[in-house]
């Protein structure tokens, strides 16, 4: 087998160097081509009085390819056929011997058809994983020790390796999907924050005053309205012979000027010195930094102060327990009290015999 592989390796190297196919080298066509090329080069050297390098350049053949063609032997196809026949006979005898011994060996293993394969119309086979009761991998080890069929160990090993590869790919796929999903969500949030910040930087800001009282706003609106509606104004103008008012006059006024804008625009300044950097006014800077996750020192101090106030409101110090002592009672008279039913202030009577 080693000789056959060596010859094949040499054939592929010659095919790469000469530009000929491996089939041409094995069939002997390359040897005929090499002889014709050598004869043509020799003719150019002798008749044309050229050097070998000039003859190779005239025939557009490199020196490496010419040397490789000279190394091709005419007996290469015969040697390859002999080696291949010898290897084929050896491998055939080994395969025959293996098949005979496998057939004559008494097999005690039962290979019953699984119940899942009895249903030929079923497209998928249900998979039930190993139930490792003692420790992870116990069923796999016990199967290797007690349940390996020596005649089908290759297919069983292929099944185990395929299952391990599939489980690894499944876990890796889930991990990659979770990672990329989180990454996309983070980048999307960053892009949204960046878009909002650019919008707030480039937008035109105005300072306006909103009415605090709805009724006062309605009062001013109706007070500024003309006393006549548009049809009455046109009829009055037609009778007086003056130009009839139209929509533009109502919107722009009698002098053709627009009403003043009810707001003041914030002047926008560019980057100093033409640096083309991002600029923002001071009152807008905390909002932009907050979108990017940063806080100014003043804003951070205010946030910490509010958090401390909330913590103090939520935290209630435990009330001190006051130890109550028993009230001092009046002293008890040591004299024995009168327990009889008679009056304690009775007079004693003495019996005189």
From Swiss-Prot:
How is this protein named in the record?
Minor capsid protein VP2
Return the annotated region ranges for Disordered.
Answer: 301-353
Is the keyword Transmembrane helix in the record?
Answer: yes
Species, as recorded: Bovine polyomavirus
UniProt-annotated stretches for the region D1: 262-297
Residues passing through the membrane, by range: 279-299
Naming one, the record's GO cellular component terms include: membrane
Annotated motif Nuclear localization signal: location in the chain? 318-327
**Region entry DNA-binding, spans:** 302-353
Top-level lineage group: Viruses
Q: Which UniProt keywords apply?
A: Capsid protein, DNA-binding, Host endoplasmic reticulum, Host membrane, Host nucleus, Late protein, Lipoprotein, Membrane, Myristate, Transmembrane, Transmembrane helix, Viral penetration into host nucleus, Virion, Virus entry into host cell
Coiled-coil annotated spans: none
Q: Which InterPro entries match?
A: Polyoma_coat_VP2 (IPR001070)
**Gene Ontology biological-process entries:** symbiont entry into host cell; viral penetration into host nucleus
Family the entry assigns: Belongs to the polyomaviruses capsid protein VP2 family.
N-myristoyl glycine-type lipidated residues: 2
Q: Where is the composition biased (Acidic residues)?
A: 301-316
């Amino acid at each position: 087998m080693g000789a056959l592989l060596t010859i094949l390796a040499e054939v592929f190297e010659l095919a790469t160097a000469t530009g000929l196919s491996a089939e041409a080298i094995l069939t002997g066509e390359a040897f005929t081509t090499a002889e014709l090329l050598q004869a043509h080069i020799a003719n150019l050297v002798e008749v044309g009085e050229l050097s070998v390098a000039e003859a190779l350049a005239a025939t557009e053949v490199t020196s490496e390819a010419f040397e490789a063609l000279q190394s091709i032997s005419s007996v290469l196809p015969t040697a390859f056929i002999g080696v291949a026949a010898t290897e084929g006979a050896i491998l055939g005898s080994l395969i025959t011997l293996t098949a005979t011994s496998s057939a004559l060996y008494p097999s005690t293993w039962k290979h019953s058809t699984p119940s899942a394969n009895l249903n030929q119309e079923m497209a998928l086979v249900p998979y039930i994983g190993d139930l490792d009761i003692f420790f992870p991998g116990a069923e796999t080890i016990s199967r290797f020790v007690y349940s390996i069929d020596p005649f089908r160990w290759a297919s069983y090993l292929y099944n185990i390796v395929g299952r391990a590869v599939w489980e690894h790919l499944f876990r890796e796929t889930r991990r990659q999907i979770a990672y990329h999903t989180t990454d996309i969500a983070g980048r999307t949030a960053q892009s949204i924050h960046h878009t909002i910040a650019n919008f707030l930087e480039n937008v035109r800001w105005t300072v306006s005053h909103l009415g605090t009282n709805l009724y006062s706003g309605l009062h001013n609106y109706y007070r500024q309205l003309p006393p006549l509606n548009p049809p009455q104004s046109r009829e009055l103008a037609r009778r007086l012979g003056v130009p009839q008012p139209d929509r533009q006059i109502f919107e722009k006024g009698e002098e053709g000027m627009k009403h003043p804008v009810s707001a003041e625009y914030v002047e926008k300044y560019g980057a100093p010195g033409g640096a083309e950097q991002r600029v923002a006014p001071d009152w807008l800077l905390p909002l932009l930094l907050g979108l990017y996750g940063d806080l100014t020192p003043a804003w951070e101090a205010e946030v910490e102060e509010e958090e401390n106030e909330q913590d103090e409101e939520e935290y209630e110090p435990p009330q001190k327990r006051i130890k109550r002592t028993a009230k001092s009672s009046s002293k008890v008279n040591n004299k024995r009290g009168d327990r009889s039913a008679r009056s304690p202030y009775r007079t004693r009577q003495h019996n005189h015999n």
